[in-house]
Amino acid sequence: MAVGKNKRLSKGKKGIKKRVVDPFSRKEWYDIKAPAFFEVKNVGKTLVNRTAGLKNANDSLKGRILEVSLADLQKDEEHAFRKVKLRVEDIQGKSCLTSFNGLSITSDKLRSLVRKWQTTIEADQTIKTTDGYLCRVFVIGFTRRRANQVKKTTYAQSSQIRAIRQKMFQVIQNQTSSCSMRELVQKLIPEVIGREIERATGSIFPLQNVLVRKVKILKAPKHDAQKLLELHGESQDVGTKVVKDVAPLESV
């Protein structure tokens, strides 16, 4: 066996052991405040690095997009399949004031609606609210059986699909053209647009599960601190409750 120097035994430690720094010690929590047209205003908290040197914590928070379940905002599990996007517009103390920045439904809900023996009909319309928001509304619906129908399938003809899509365009335009963003959200929560489409298209072909699949904000108006404060109302944890219009649909 060769005799030599054991490098592992004689090798010393290089330098001093580095001190472990907790990364959360450099961060601080901010409260997230939702607009007043949601029932719950105090949504949760978000992390951000503390203000240090030229880096301001407020600048890091402004423009941040947060995704929240509508069930948490409305205290109602019926809305668990909807997701709402909130955008941080301004900082007041340790509170982030947000604005509505979009709506969508979960992928598992969408997949559960697509079935055999029916036709899927989709439409989208670009609208502008009275307070300057340019957004695109996506709607989806599915055909259903007529009254006393024996046939298994419920496929719609191409002419019927075109006619239904035109009705969807008309309903979206009529329901959204003369309302602000606050009024639009209050129509989206109880699904007013979907039920109105079902009523309007009943004479062409009966539909079911008509939903506003997505709302995308294309352009928002210039930030106005006064309007943002009006949007949030008084600084309380509970906002206004949206009344559900649960009028039953007439049988076709």
From Swiss-Prot:
The modification Phosphoserine is found at residue 251. The modification N-acetylalanine is found at residue 2. InterPro entries: Ribosomal_eS1, Ribosomal_eS1_CS, Ribosomal_eS1_euk. GO terms for molecular function: structural constituent of ribosome. It holds the Pfam family Ribosomal_S3Ae. GO terms for biological process: cytoplasmic translation; ribosome biogenesis. The keyword Acetylation applies. The keyword Cytoplasm applies. One of its GO terms (cellular component) is cytosol. It is found in: Cytoplasm. Keywords: Acetylation, Cytoplasm, Phosphoprotein, Ribonucleoprotein, Ribosomal protein. PROSITE patterns: RIBOSOMAL_S3AE. Disulfide bonds: none annotated. Component of the small ribosomal subunit (SSU). Mature yeast ribosomes consist of a small (40S) and a large (60S) subunit. The 40S small subunit contains 1 molecule of ribosomal RNA (18S rRNA) and at least 33 different proteins. The large 60S subunit contains 3 rRNA molecules (25S, 5.8S and 5S rRNA) and at least 46 different proteins. eS1 interacts directly with uS11 and eS26, which form part of the mRNA exit tunnel. There are 2 genes for eS1 in S.pombe. Component of the ribosome, a large ribonucleoprotein complex responsible for the synthesis of proteins in the cell. The small ribosomal subunit (SSU) binds messenger RNAs (mRNAs) and translates the encoded message by selecting cognate aminoacyl-transfer RNA (tRNA) molecules. The large subunit (LSU) contains the ribosomal catalytic site termed the peptidyl transferase center (PTC), which catalyzes the formation of peptide bonds, thereby polymerizing the amino acids delivered by tRNAs into a polypeptide chain. Belongs to the eukaryotic ribosomal protein eS1 family. This is Small ribosomal subunit protein eS1B. It comes from Schizosaccharomyces pombe (strain 972 / ATCC 24843). The gene is rps102.
